[in-house]
Regions:
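Structural signature of tandem-repeat unit edges
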Residues: 1-123, 128-146, 153-170, 176-285, ...
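Alpha-helical elements of the RecA-like P-loop NTPase motor core of helicases
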Residues: 210, 362, 385, 580
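Extended alpha-helical scaffolding segments
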Residues: 531-593
Length: 596
């Protein structure tokens, strides 16, 4: 706004500070009864303008007026608004036609009755300075809503006493006593001020909770009309709630956690719950989402537990420890999935009775470093440990029969993820698809496969990312190795030994070839490195560490000559030792000249 264009102009009984389009200030002559608004826009700030014109009783809005924003206290005694503008309506209040928005109720007196059927939306400070304490029509229109949290600030409606810790205006909670221990909510609420009850809230209609934007630590349920457990999940999902107490026959509550009346199903743990949770004996099922996003650190299952629902512990970012007990045999029964996705485990030990780990059961556990699978485990479903970048060592038990697609794959955006080692004595069905993934990769991660079974000892280095066709063929060959007769004449062994040739891009291929020879010392990889020294060196510089470059050039068959392109890459990585080595190339340096 350029104040140089503004000036005072007199219109009738008033003067307006305006640039001809927008008015930002008003002065009214003493004893003036009427003020006419003639400019397109009126925008007078309630904080900077404290003027009061108590003599004015009528406001006239001319045809070309588009918007009016003025302090409600400026004209405390207005009784009538006359509008020739299509943007406002005639009446006792200043109401915008679009949306039927109440801008100003004006002063009114204590005995005045505000008719809430005249508008559908209440703007901020619409009742500031309004002395009226009575209202009609609050429940007659389902369209009525409060648009601003300061709508009733400074109004006579707030002069009423607190009842049950709240002040209500029909279906609107306009104030909350934040000092009392308990708040009692009415059954029907359409709006609540953004204040938080200090300790506890008592609820007779669970649907009202959706209007309470700041919940206390404890919620008491007294809604006998509840017929769906989902209502608890969706209405009580606030991180502020630490304890739930049930006063209805449908539920029992222990330590703030909700169970079915027969204590066979754990239905909901409040998200604010912390510390250790010991689930009581007799509980058979944990319902879907029951612990999702809670703050618990440890959970102990009873021996009676049989089933864990979808995403039951999803996103428990502080859950570090779990005791499975001796009862549950399948984590992810009946298609349930993502039960523990996104938790904070560093180590998981599965007891011997666990036979199956379900789909995505422990995916996205970024802190997970160690998993102990006991004998008895038969099936690991697809994506069970997907995107666990710190899970680098997998030892599968001899009892394993099948591993699902992408069970141990990392396909996230981190580029420098260490290689994963997988050790097996029994080859489960689908192992190839469980550890490789179709598509490109971020970085050069590999899987080192060690098989020690009755057919012999085999070591392969597989690229994590391959084409769909290559992944399928790799899987078939690994599956065939489970057949004793076939394994002894397996022509596909060479295919696995040269798996680097099937990496998803050329740079990846050279890096995997280096890793293959370093790990398995096979002849094919040696010949490949010998024929592609420069490409391999460049791949190592771009994707790996300086020590890898040193190890590569120390291979007794490698004779990497000075190359400007390689020198440039080394300079960009600031690998000073490797750069010095290349610059000294050809000067008769000893074989072990490069030390990192």
């Amino acid at each position: 706004m350029n104040n140089n264009n503004y000036k005072w102009e007199t219109v009738g009984n008033a003067k307006f500070y305006t640039d001809g389009t927008t008015c930002t200030d008003i002065e009214v002559m003493d004893n003036a009864k009427t003020v006419s608004f003639i400019y397109p826009k009126f925008k007078i700030d309630r904080e900077t303008c404290q003027k009061v014109f108590s003599s004015v009783e009528n406001l006239i809005i001319e045809r070309n007026v588009l918007s009016i924003i003025i302090p409600n206290k400026m004209f405390p005694n207005v009784k009538k608004v006359e509008s020739e503008s299509s943007n406002f309506i005639d009446g006792k209040y200043l109401i915008e036609r679009t949306g039927m928005r109440l801008r100003n109720a004006f002063g009114q007196n204590e005995n005045a009755v505000i008719d809430f059927t005249q508008f559908n939306r209440i703007e901020n400070y619409a009742f500031e300075g309004c002395k009226a304490k009575n209202a009609v029509g609050l429940t007659k229109t389902r369209f009525l809503n409060v648009h601003g949290d300061a709508a009733f600030d400074g109004s006579g409606f707030l002069d009423q006493p607190f009842i049950g810790g709240i002040k209500c205006l029909g279906p609107f909670i306009i104030d909350i006593d934040e000092t009392v221990n308990e708040i009692v909510l009415p059954e029907k609420i359409r709006y609540c001020v953004p204040k938080r009850p200090q300790k506890c809230i008592r609820v007779s209609d669970i649907d009202t909770l959706s209007k309470i934007r700041k919940l206390p630590q404890k919620v008491i349920i007294e809604d006998d009309k509840m017929y769906s457990d989902d209502a608890l999940l969706y209405k009580l999902c606030s991180h502020d709630i630490e304890e739930i107490e049930s006063h209805i026959s449908r539920y029992k509550t222990i330590d703030g956690i909700v169970y079915s009346a027969d204590m066979k199903t754990l239905i909901l743990c409040p998200r604010g719950k912390t510390g250790e949770v010991r689930i009581p004996d007799g509980v058979v099922r944990i319902r879907k989402h029951a612990f999702s996003h809670t703050k618990i650190k440890k959970v102990i299952f009873p021996d009676t537990l049989q089933m864990i629902g979808d995403e039951a512990f999803y996103g428990c970012a502080e859950l570090e420890e779990i005791d499975f007990g001796h009862g549950i045999t399948r984590i992810g029964e009946n298609g349930n999935q993502s039960m523990f996705s996104g938790c904070a485990f560093k180590k998981i030990t599965f007891p011997p009775q666990i036979k199956e780990i379900g789909m995505r059961a422990f995916s996205l556990c970024y802190e997970l470093e160690e998993v102990i699978f006991n004998e008895g485990l038969e099936v690991i479903q697809k994506e069970a440990f997907q995107n666990c970048p710190n899970l680098l060592e997998i030892n599968l038990p001899a009892s394993i029969k099948k591993v699902g697609t992408d069970a141990f794959v990392y396909n996230g955006s981190y580029s420098h993820i260490p290689d994963m080692n997988i050790n097996i004595t029994t080859i489960p069905e689908n192992l190839g698809l469980a550890i490789t993934h179709p598509g490109n990769t971020y970085g050069v991660r590999c899987v080192n496969v060690h098989i020690d079974n009755r057919n012999g000892i085999f070591d392969f280095v597989l690229p994590c990312s391959v084409s769909v066709i290559v992944g399928a063929r790799t899987n078939i060959i690994i599956n065939q190795m489970a057949d004793c007769k076939y394994a002894k004449k397996l022509s596909g062994l060479r295919y696995l030994e040269t798996a680097y040739m099937n990496a998803s891009n050329s740079m990846y291929k050279y890096a995997v070839a280096y890793k293959t020879y370093k790990k398995a010392k096979n002849k094919c990889a040696k010949e490949f490195l010998l024929d592609n020294q420069k490409h391999v060196a460049k791949a190592i510089i771009l994707e790996m560490e300086e020590k890898d470059f040193a190890d590569f050039v120390k291979f007794d068959f490698i004779n990497l000559k000075y190359d400007e392109d390689i020198v440039k890459c080394l300079e960009e990585r600031n690998w000073t030792a490797a750069l010095a080595y290349m610059l000294e190339e050809g000067k008769g340096r000893p074989e072990d000249a490069l030390v990192i």
